């Protein structure tokens, strides 16, 4: 009796509502786009800042090693600091860009030493010191000058205090970095990125990061190539969009300049549209999407509150429970999750209309996919929280947090 009012599943083959030309065009764009992205990724990894085997002073003192830099990077990721500050200009911005912060502080310290020593043209000497590349690719050894070494030791102490017991006043957990060893590794990581941002790339007059971040203390200014390619990219983007519309307007028979007649639109009442089982199953997707969107809004509001009052939430110590880096991590991840879930649900719902048919038992796979989405969402949010809180086993490549936008751990990636 309960099945009498239920509409039978529509299994008839329907005509495609999208022409094959559009499908082929999208496929071509995707192939070309991913090819270009692959080429850029190849050059990014091959032309990136080299990680020296060891960094030494002019007296031969080993300041830090390759493993120390990697350990600092892992600590930076695991504690969610990418969602608090940034590195080489990429990340969250409640905190500083630690590359720029280290570079400015260290360069100012080395300049002050030269001014106090009454060196001839201290500003030019300071610029030359920072832009000189003392990395030997054959031995893997990077040598820091006497002034840079002194600045490094000073900043180890500074960042140890920065991430110490009073870090809750910065929107982080108190004692966010566990112990002086981890703070030193973080400083090693910052120092390495600052060196790469200032030292000239071999054979060129600009740094490994194209003189970014900008800092007049070390003569980090935009290069001519950077300006030219930035302008050209804007011209191609805007001009290419205009050319695309011009071509479509010239040859389209529906909405172009020479259309034969105005196309008429007709809509089928929703009550007359037969839905498949998988299309009905997507209703659960949209319910989950709404819940994720609501949660994203709430944690986003908490993250923005830190910009108004970084030390408390109407008298409540919010950083002790939901530090800024965790709130922003969840905010960014939830935006990606509900958007991805919406694309999945939209694809499942529209596929039968586009293809004209639906594979048998696809609704079962739809529920399996919904379960997989739930596992990834709740599992990754939990692992990110454990990573930020510094739980000993929730770190490293398996459970630890990663770079911004791909914060979810390898376990759920």
Residue ranges and their predicted role:
Residues 46-226:
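Soluble extramembrane regions of membrane proteins in the secretory/endomembrane system
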Residues 45-66, 90-94, 107-110, 210-223, ...:
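Membrane-interface interhelical loops and short amphipathic "cap" helices
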Residues 2-17, 254-282:
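Membrane-interfacial, low-structure loops and terminal tails that flank and connect transmembrane helices
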Residues 176-220, 226, 267-305, 312, ...:
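Extramembranous, membrane-proximal N-terminal regions and early juxtamembrane loops
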Residues 22-43, 76, 84, 203, ...:
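Hydrophobic cores of alpha-helical transmembrane segments in multi-pass integral membrane proteins
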Residues 82-87, 92-121, 358-405:
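Hydrophobic or amphipathic alpha-helical targeting/insertion segments
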Residues 2-64:
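Post-cleavage N-terminal segment of exported redox proteins
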Residues 256-269, 319-327, 349-366, 393-400:
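Flexible loop linkers connecting adjacent transmembrane helices
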């Amino acid at each position: 009796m309960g099945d009498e009012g239920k509409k039978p599943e529509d299994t008839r083959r329907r005509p495609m509502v999208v022409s094959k030309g559009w499908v082929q065009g999208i496929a071509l764009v995707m192939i070309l786009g991913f090819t270009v992205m692959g080429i850029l990724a190849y050059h990014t990894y091959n032309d990136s800042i080299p990680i020296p085997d060891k960094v030494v002073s002019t007296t031969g003192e080993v300041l830090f090693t390759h493993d120390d830099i990697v350990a600092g990077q892992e600590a930076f990721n695991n504690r969610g600091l990418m969602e608090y500050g940034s590195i080489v200009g990429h990340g969250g911005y409640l905190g500083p860009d630690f590359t720029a912060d280290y570079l400015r502080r260290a360069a100012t310290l080395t300049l002050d030493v030269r001014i106090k020593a009454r060196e001839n043209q201290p500003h030019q000497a300071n610029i030359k010191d920072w832009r000189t590349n003392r990395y030997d690719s054959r031995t893997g050894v990077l040598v820091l000058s006497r002034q840079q070494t002194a600045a490094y030791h000073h900043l180890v102490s500074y960042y140890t205090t920065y991430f110490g017991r009073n870090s809750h006043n910065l929107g982080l957990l108190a004692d966010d970095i566990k112990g002086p060893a981890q703070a030193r590794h973080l400083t090693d990581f910052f120092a390495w990125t600052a060196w790469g941002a200032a030292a000239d790339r071999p054979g060129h007059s600009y740094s490994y990061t194209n003189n970014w971040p900008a800092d007049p203390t070390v003569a980090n200014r935009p290069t001519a190539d950077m300006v030219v390619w930035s302008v050209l990219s804007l011209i191609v983007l805007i001009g290419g969009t205009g050319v695309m519309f011009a071509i479509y307007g010239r040859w389209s028979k529906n909405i172009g300049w020479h259309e034969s007649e105005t196309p008429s639109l007709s809509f089928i009442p929703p009550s007359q549209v037969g839905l498949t089982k998988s299309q009905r199953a997507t209703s659960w997707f949209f319910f989950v999407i709404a819940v994720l969107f609501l949660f994203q809004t709430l944690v986003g509001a908490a993250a923005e509150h830190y910009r108004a009052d970084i030390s408390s939430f109407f008298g409540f110590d919010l950083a002790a429970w939901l530090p800024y880096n965790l709130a922003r991590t969840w905010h960014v991840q939830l935006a990606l999750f509900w958007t991805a879930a919406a694309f999945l649900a939209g694809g499942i719902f529209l596929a039968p209309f586009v293809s004209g048919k639906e594979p048998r038992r696809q609704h079962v796979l739809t529920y399996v996919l919904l379960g997989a989405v739930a596992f990834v969402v709740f599992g990754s949010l939990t692992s990110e929280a454990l990573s930020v809180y510094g739980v000993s086993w929730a770190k490293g490549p398996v459970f630890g947090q990663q770079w911004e936008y791909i914060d979810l751990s390898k376990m759920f990636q």
